[in-house]
Amino acid sequence: AGSKVVGYFTEWGTYDRKYYVKNIEXS
């Protein structure tokens, strides 16, 4: 379960960064 959580957070963090940058470019 531990490694599964780490993989989830890593994947979500990458997506969140892309979305954040996209948001800045749009404004």
From Swiss-Prot:
Catalytic reactions on record: Random endo-hydrolysis of N-acetyl-beta-D-glucosaminide (1->4)-beta-linkages in chitin and chitodextrins
InterPro entries (UniProt xref): Glyco_hydro18_cat (IPR001223)
Root EC class: hydrolase
GO biological process per UniProt: chitin catabolic process; polysaccharide catabolic process
Record note on quaternary structure: Homodimer.
Function of the molecule: Able to cleave chitin oligomers from N=3 to 6.
Protein name: Chitinase 47 kDa
Organism: Streptomyces olivaceoviridis
